[in-house]
Amino acid sequence: MEKVSLARGTRDFGPAQMAKRSFIIDTIKKVFQQYGFQPLETPAMENLSTLQGKYGEEGDQLLFKILNSGDFLKNVNKKNIEEGNWKMVTGDIAEKGLRYDLTVPFARYVVMNRHEITFPFKRYQIQPVWRADRPQKGRYREFYQCDADVVGTNSLMCEAEIILMIKDAFNKLGILDYTIKVNHRGVLSGLAGLLSAAEKETSLFVAIDKLDKIGEQKVKEELIERGFDAASLPQLFEVLNFTGSTQNKINFLSSKFSNSEIGKKGLNDLNEVLNLLKNFGATDEHVELDLTLARGLSYYTGCIFEVKINRASVGSVSGGGRYDNLTAVFDSKEKSSGVGFSFGIDRLYDAMEELSLFPKETISTSKILIVHLDKESFHYSLKAAQTIRLNGIACEVYPDQTKIKKQMEYADKKNIPFVVVIGSEEIKTNLFTLKKMETGEQSKLTIEQIIKSIK
């Protein structure tokens, strides 16, 4: 017999896992929809010309390519094979690839449909993506992304709504101890201005992003190695080490950025987002200005977000930011400003599992199992089951005529909370035994009474 196995970097999700994943996805979907976001789906495969060149050289190497159908070697230039020019060979044998993320397909969709789309366009998208990465703990070749974006507006109300959506989703998922870290591209540029090193912004951001991983001393050493003036570093770390509320940090930075227009613009944007939260009737609870947050600097141009669940061992479970050039990758003349963020479904799942946050009711699929004692009661069970289902209660009938013990074990293993026992005596009296599996408590009821008691 051939040994069967999964492809490396992929996973199966059994019924119990799928119930939990569906709980997360359905909860997030409802939150997106409450804020006016509409669903979008794009194909699993895209033309390689759409995907290549959008993720840098390293990203291009992680694209899963799809062999052309039929005689895929027909158009291959043999000279390229002889010379080991595999990039050219790949172009000859593969014209399509699996999507690497949801952002590039979204940008392609916006460009192709810009005359039909109503802007500002609010979309959410929950689909799997594929990366030819080296599999390791927490890193898979197939995983789900869960994105929400608003494109076609500069309004900072969108940033405030992102914070509200994260709060609403976490509240509904039962996640209460978390931090929404925020920063701004302009604030980061203002920090570079403190060191008179605007031309070395990227080097500065890469270094300070490591602060919580390698510590202050190592970051200082790295900055000096990168050519920063050691005498100016105390001023930088005075700012980075300042503690207090988000509002206090903004006030403190205002005095430091008196000569930085871009820094002041960043602070004003953050201040406006906080004010908009108040206008929504919310607070800045869980929101923290983190000056070391420097994600996505190649494309984020305004506010930046990252979310961590404080007692979980997983890393960030959500992140995003403001961008000004979503569609520029396809049309340099077309620049669509927008803001978006993403939930990591797999990391959210791992964190909720670790912290035992899943409600018990997410596990079972059926509320009732009907157990039958003979052929007559089996046939009666079918009608009873349909009556129960038509009243909105998930119900199943054990499909085989077998011992009651085996039927009860089935209910126990599937975590079905109630069992209804039907035999010839029950059919005569129209009273059926309803057993609560958790406690063993039993009562004699009509089908109508059973429906009423469980609803």
Label for each model-derived stretch:
Residues 1-21, 75-77, 82-96, 198:
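Auxiliary tRNA-acceptor-end handling modules of aminoacyl-tRNA synthetases
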Residues 20-35, 46-47, 81-93, 101-176, ...:
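Positively charged, Gly/Ser-enriched RNA/tRNA-binding surfaces
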Residues 38-44:
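A short beta-strand-loop structural module common to alpha/beta enzyme folds
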Residues 44-96:
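Polyanion/phosphate-binding surface patch
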Residues 61-73, 197-218, 309-310:
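Acidic, His- and aromatic-enriched active-site or binding-groove loops in soluble protein domains
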Residues 179-181:
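Cytochrome P450
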Residues 192-196:
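Short His/Asp/Glu-rich catalytic/ion-coordination signatures at enzyme active sites or charged loops
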